[in-house]
Every structure is written in C-alpha cells, then in structure tokens.
Amino acid sequence: MDAGDASRLGESLDAVSAAFQSRVMELQELVLARNMYPATAIPDLAAVDVSLTAMEAQLQAVRRRLQEEREAFPKAKKLVQQSLKQQRRLQLMLANMPTGMREDVFATPLEHNSSMMFPESLNFSSAVPEVRDHDLKIKEEPTAPPKKGRGPAPRWYISTEELDSLSSYMRGRLTLEKVNIAINEVASYADGNAHLVACPKKKLSEDTWEKALVLRDIAARESVKGKHFFLETDIKGPGLKLDTTGKAILTVLRHLGRFQETRIGHHRVFILSKQQ
C-alpha cells in the first residue's frame, strides 16, 4: 500500500462514517414514528447511540493507524534507497577485487552482521566455497591494529572503466589485478604506520621507536593529521616495488585520486584518499 492508497482508503472510511450516521438518523425517526410515546422510544435510541459511538471509535482507530503508516512511508523509502546504494557499492568493490584476494573474502565471520551484504545473484570463482551472507568478511592484512578511534586504511579499488579511461601511454601493460593488489598493499603500509604512531614506547624496540618518532612528527602536520599515510621508504613489495612497473602504478593511482603526495622534510609522503 502506498501513500495514495492510504489517502483513498481514508476518504472511503469518511464516506462510510457519513452514510452510517445518516442511516442512524433515519432509524431514530422510524423509532419515534413507531413508538407514539417518548418514554418507550428512549431505550431504543440509547441503544442506537451506544452502537454508533462504538463504530465511530473503531473508525477513528483505523484512520489513526492509516495515518501512522502513511507517515512511515518516507522513512522506509529512504532506508530502501540507502540499502540499494550500499549494495551497488559492494557489488562494484567485489567486481573489481583482484582474483588473488577473493579467497580471503570468506576467511572469517563478520564482526557486525549488518556491515556487509552480498546479493545471492553474484557469481564467484568456482574456487570460492559456497557460504551464507553472514559468513562474509574481507580479511584484513596481517598488520598491527591502527590507532584507537581510527578505522582501517581506505582500500579504494579501481574499476575496469577507470583503467580503460587512461591513455594507453599511462596504462601501459598494467592490469586491473596488479593495480588493485598494489592498493591493498599500500593500505597495509598505512595501517602499520598508524599502529606505530599510536603504540606506546615500552612496546617498541629501539629501532622501531626511532621510526615511530619520525611517523609521529609527520602525523602531527596539519596536512596529514587524522589521515592514513605511507612513505616512499615503506614500498618494498611484493605487490608494489620502486621499479618501472611500481612507478607506473603510483602514477596511475595519483592520477585517479587514490592518494595525495607531499614532501615533509626529506620524506616523500603519500596520503590515502577515502572513497567519495
């Protein structure tokens, strides 16, 4: 039932109520005509009045209920739209996920059952086991947890359309899988750096503490504060190296807005962008 149906039903109930009241008035006149003495007509009229009052109360209750449902329609519609938008986003992420990472999608159960929803119509690789929706979760890289109060580093994978939109010179021999594996790898670098920034000194070795001090100084800069980042010196493979292919991948990711690049001191800093 939509809002228009509810409105028409309310109008129909008004018409029924008016017809009922008209019929009661006719019955009252007939009772008076049948009973020549008012004393004998009063009990009949009282019984009719009681019945009418009960009917009116029921009609009012129905109208209130219809009004409540009509007011709930916009909220329900908005919720459905948000659910569809989230579903499309997850479908896009899954469609552009590297095949080498899909096996990890089903590794552990969800921490929050409502955080991931995959439609049953999606067809996965035959190597992926059949599972139920509440068993799905993208496995995080085995890095230390990020700073408390901050979520994991964004993994904004590129789509086939974005890769095809690049010039052949920029794209070169890059594939969707190579680029998205690199995205996952740099996000793991950023997660590791966030952990070092938040970790107390007593839990770090002397060498690691020196790096943590450098990262904390960078994280305190206004352009970096509150964001996930990694350094050029973090890039050590295996999915991304500072070779010709790795530099081409960094150029593509910068062009597609996956990160912003800046220089702080003698460090080349890459600040990850969140998906719009």
Curated annotation (Swiss-Prot):
Coiled coil spans: 48-78
Keywords (A to Z) from UniProt: Coiled coil
Pfam families on file: SKA1 (PF07160)
InterPro entries the record matches: SKA1, SKA1_MBD_sf
GO molecular function: microtubule binding
Record keyword Ligase present: no
Provenance organism: Oryza sativa subsp. indica
GO cellular component annotations of the record: mitotic spindle; outer kinetochore; spindle microtubule
Disulfide bridge positions per record: none
Superkingdom of source: Eukaryota
UniProt similarity note: Belongs to the SKA1 family.
Protein name per UniProt: SKA complex subunit 1 homolog
One GO process term, biological-process aspect: regulation of microtubule polymerization or depolymerization
Coiled coil found in the keyword field: yes
Gene3D superfamilies (UniProt xref): Ska1 microtubule binding domain-like (1.10.10.1890)
